[in-house]
């Protein structure tokens, strides 16, 4: 490849006058960085909680305990500190569906949605064999050693006695009182609904007189004015008073029957919620 150079002959010099732009200048836009948008958190508007049915394995009973678990509307599995929670035990010859049938969880939905009570978790286990008392049955041990740890490991519940309650109706109330006074370091609140106590259970209540005041559970007792076990319930209340146990006793119109308990499930929830608030404020 050859490069050939050519030169112009007798050419006139070319003037080098700079060109001037006479057009109107346009404003120059400077890019402005866009602000990072913060995602708007989703607002939960649910008005109903959810009910789970789970089988919790137990070593004491060598079988599982079928358990209904109520999670409140807008349940947050990562809630800081966890929800206060309540174990509710059914009566003799019934199942763990009893509290559902009485309307307990429907009442919880209404009271939580209206902000009358704080959201809480409710645990309703099934006692299959209900004939033995605490000396013969290991149901109480299974609750303490298997059910309670399972709930605290798998659900967003508070792990302090001030936000842990146990209650029940009739025989279930017997278990609640038994566990509440045998393990006052675990449960800060006990509910006994239409509850004549297990034989010998008054001794555990009398023993509470020697506990520091902050270690004694708050107790709710109620019964119908026509309850066939009313006298035994009154003996229970007298024992609480003599032992210096903080309690509230309500006598409503009614008998020892489902229509009585269903009429007062909202009252029970209000009381448990107030008790949680009281214990938390005293910490």
Residue map of PLM features:
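C-terminal motif of bacterial Sec signal peptides marking the signal peptidase cleavage site
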Residues: 4-5
């Amino acid at each position: 490849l050859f490069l050939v150079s050519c030169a112009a002959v007798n050419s006139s010099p070319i003037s080098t006058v700079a060109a001037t732009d006479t057009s109107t200048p346009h404003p120059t836009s400077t890019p402005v960085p866009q602000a990072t948008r913060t995602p708007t958190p989703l607002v939960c508007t649910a008005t109903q909680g959810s009910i789970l049915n789970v089988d919790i394995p137990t070593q004491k009973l060598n079988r599982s305990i079928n358990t209904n678990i109520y999670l409140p509307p807008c349940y947050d599995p990562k809630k800081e500190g966890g929800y206060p929670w309540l174990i509710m035990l059914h009566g003799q010859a019934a199942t763990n569906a009893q509290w559902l049938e009485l309307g307990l969880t429907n009442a919880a939905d209404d009271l939580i949605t209206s902000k009358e009570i704080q959201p809480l978790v409710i645990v309703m286990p099934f006692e299959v064999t209900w004939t033995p008392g605490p000396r013969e049955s290991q149901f109480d041990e299974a609750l303490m050693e298997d059910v309670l740890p399972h709930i605290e490991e798998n659900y967003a519940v508070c792990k302090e006695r001030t936000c842990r309650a146990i209650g029940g109706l009739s025989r279930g109330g017997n278990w609640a009182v038994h566990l509440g006074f045998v393990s006052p370091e675990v449960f800060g609140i006990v509910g006994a609904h239409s509850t004549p106590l297990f034989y010998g259970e008054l001794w555990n209540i009398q023993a509470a007189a020697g506990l520091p005041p902050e270690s004694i559970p708050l107790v709710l007792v109620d019964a119908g004015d026509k309850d066939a076990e009313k006298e035994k319930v009154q003996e229970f209340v007298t024992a609480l008073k003599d032992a210096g146990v903080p309690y509230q006793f309500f006598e409503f119109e009614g008998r020892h029957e489902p229509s009585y308990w269903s009429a007062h499930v909202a009252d029970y929830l209000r009381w448990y919620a107030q008790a949680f608030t009281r214990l938390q404020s005293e910490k």
